[in-house]
């Protein structure tokens, strides 16, 4: 059964899809950078996007049964959040170096900002969801 677009909510798993979308978009953008900057700009950016995707997948793979497992899940989400802010800095540097099209940078940063919001929201929901575990 279809849901009217205006009535749809975000899925609880949206942060994984957005991380994947960010990973793919970052690699596509890095492939267009000049080859002489591969080791200085492209590889670190692609690696950062890869780590973000890996960390959210790792966090999602943990089904907490106690507070220790909740903390492990939270640690992965915190790492993903830190990498997202790292990626913001790298996008800014790449924009200064290569003069990336404004619309392209805006689209890229919108994905990053959305992922930051989703990861923080997931951490907040987890805090409420798992507060009564032993």
Whereabouts are the PLM-identified features?
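Amphipathic alpha-helical assembly/interaction segments
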Residues: 1-134
């Amino acid at each position: 059964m279809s849901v009217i677009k205006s009535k749809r909510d975000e899925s609880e798993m949206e942060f994984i899809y957005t991380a994947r979308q960010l990973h793919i978009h970052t690699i596509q953008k890095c492939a267009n950078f000049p080859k002489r900057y591969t080791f200085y700009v492209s590889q670190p950016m692609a690696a950062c996007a890869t780590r973000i995707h890996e960390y959210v997948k790792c966090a999602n793979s943990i089904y907490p049964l106690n507070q220790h497992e909740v903390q492990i899940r939270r640690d992965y989400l915190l790492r993903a959040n830190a990498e997202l802010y790292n990626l913001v800095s790298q996008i800014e540097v790449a924009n200064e170096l290569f003069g990336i099209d404004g619309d392209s940078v805006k689209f890229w940063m919108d994905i990053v900002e959305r992922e930051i919001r989703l990861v923080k929201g997931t951490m907040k929901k987890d805090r409420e969801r798992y507060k009564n575990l032993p």
